[in-house]
Amino acid sequence: MMTANAPEQLEWSGKNGAEERFFCMTAEPGASFEEELHSLMARYRNLGGGEEDEFLLRFHVSDPVRQSAALRRMIGERNSYVSMVGQPPANGARVALEAWHIGGMLGKRRRAEPGGTVVEALRAHYRLFLAGKREFSAPDSCGQMREEFRWLDRIAALQGGAVADLIHRTWIYCRDIDNNYRGLVEGRNGCFDRYGLTAESHFIASTGIEGCTELPGRLLHMDSLGIA
């Protein structure tokens, strides 16, 4: 929850020298989406956002169908993972922002894969990657959830492993969650069974919450974080 009293930037430093920054910012209500986004991104830059260590940008918007084109145009081409979800900010504004920055990256790669996008942050002994699928074909939430994991199977294989071993966290956004959450859970649990994940082994940390994309027929969207 983004609240008025919460800091807009948090920083962590590890004993091994790793440094991370997390931004959590909400626009002030303005005359238009473009005005709000312009002001929000200026605040983000003033706090040091948008530099080479930017890894993730997630925008929470009030109307992704109408706002997606303007958002892409205004933020420009970025070598970061960019996600957009229809989740209106509680203060009446049209846009809010999460951003994750990782210091000390040896490199960063963003590439288009068939059906989606992968961004890698390279470290000395491992790499972090964020992955998200763009396309869908199944008409229901259970089928779309299975499609998400089938696509992720291929991405994990390209990273040199399997979903059960590499994927640590997923964020799943579900349109009309009252009617589609059951299918989400059935599809996800079926995939976890296929991977052999149990309470005795481990499960992939997973958030399933109300949210929509710019595609009206798309009932689910999943962002995934892995370590390879």
Regions found by a protein language model. Give the residues of each.
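Short, polar/acidic, helix-capping and beta-turn segments at strand->helix junctions
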Residues: 1-228
